[in-house]
Amino acid sequence: MTAQLTQELPEFPTWLNARPSTLQEHRGRALVLAFVNASSVWCAERLAELAHWQARSPGRLQVIVVQVPRFDSEREPQRALKQLRGHGVSAPILLDRDWETWRRFGIESWPTLVLLDAYGRERQRLVGVTGDLDKALVALCEGQQLPSDADLHEVAERDPEPRLELRFPTGLAATEDRLYIADTGHHRVLECTHGGRVLRQFGHGNADFIDGGVGEAAFRRPQGLALERDQLYVADTGNHALRRINLRSGQVDTLCGTGRSGEPVEGPLAFAGASALHYPQGLAVADNQVLIAMAGDNRIWSYDLGRAALSARAGTGALEIRDGSGHLAAFAQPAGLAAVQQVAYVCDGLGSSIRTMQLRGDLVQTLVGGQGTWQFGDEDGPRGTARLQFPQAIALATDSPMLWIADTGNGRLRCLRLGGGELTTVLLPRRLHGPAGLAVAAGAVWIAETDAHAVLRYDLASGELRDVSIEE
């Protein structure tokens, strides 16, 4: 395309983690305007690619993230900031609350990257997750001056997240005396007592993709957990891999995944890297299979532990909501999973819905929500009228008909009695901050309060909600 000076940003934008600035001020170095949505895993992937490129080429590229809300909760500055920081974003973020910047630049879908050269001229647009980003950025930065000392020392984020024992925890698993936490922002998995004392740490805390013992292994933004006897299965989301922790030996190994996103391949795997995965997020174990909510390709997959084989169970791959059998059904970024008695329960995040999949026949049906990918709300009641907003986690005990739901966008814990019950909100003393992980065990619902960097315990008998103080 012919290079031309680009539009300026709106006059009074909302900056979430940086001082207000104009595009004019950023001239002198190449700049990417990244139009994204914080709830989209495709956007999270593009942002991770940009951050990786900046780390490899310090001082050469500036990035401004333009957050365009899909959900009502994302219009709240603090919630939008937390979501993006949860993806590891530290670049300046502009909240385009009413889509003004989106319209000004003529954006049609997210993620869209608008590439501006050092003179403020638009050179290219990359739409979606296809296209050679590395090649485009190399060409964009070609010929510009070497970065100065000031360029190499980027301005620190305004009001950074506090340094706490946990950072954006997500997946949980629990037994009668143990609690397992995916400490996502610290790239590790913790084994704790119910009181919060850390017994073991799996993953040394630096983002990497390494198998090995307790002090050697490494994860990258792990999320979903599923426990089966002495094996803990981990959705190593940032590495696009399915990992396994042997709780007797502490050994971590990779069952499937290459460390990079890609199209999964059905069939037996000769070795772990024989098939890529695409943003695995939720896990459940049933019938010697690890069920995988593959948020990046909008399908439910399974990994056969006996045959070391991958199978696509349900979903077309299109981001839609449609009931039906197996590959006739469609999901909208499935996130959380639970399974019991030959049924898998799925949190369909962008569909703001709860779906079921029969493990015999793979028939998919909608329990709550499912009216469309832009239909959401905060409403209890019969299944046909109840509403959720971007639910991310689901849990149930094997001996109870109660389904527990982390209604992430609404900051609520919801429950649904199986067999015809209505959706109800659990009365808590306060609204939760981005809950994105659940487990049920030992008379309690364990909640990963992700945006607050905390884990909570909700006592089923007394209704008491308290913090689990994590102590290393």
Predicted regions and their residues:
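N-terminal "domain-start" segment that seeds a small globular fold
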Residues: M1-L23
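Short active-site neighborhood of thiol/selenol oxidoreductases, capturing the structured segment around
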Residues: T22-A44
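Structural microenvironment flanking redox-active thiols in thiol-disulfide oxidoreductases
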Residues: A44-G86, E100-T101
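Short, internal strand/loop/helix patches
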Residues: L81-S109
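A short, hydrophobic beta-strand/beta-hairpin element that forms part of a small beta-sheet core
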Residues: E100, P111-L126
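Gly/Pro-rich loop segments of beta-rich domains
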Residues: A150-T170, G196-R221, Q251-Q281, A309-Q333, ...
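Residue-level detector of Asp-centered blade-edge/turn motifs that repeat once per structural unit
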Residues: A174-E176, L227-R229, V285-N288, A339-Q341, ...
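Conserved beta-strand positions in repeat-built beta-propeller and related beta-rich domains
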Residues: I181-G185, V234-G238, H278, I292-G296, ...
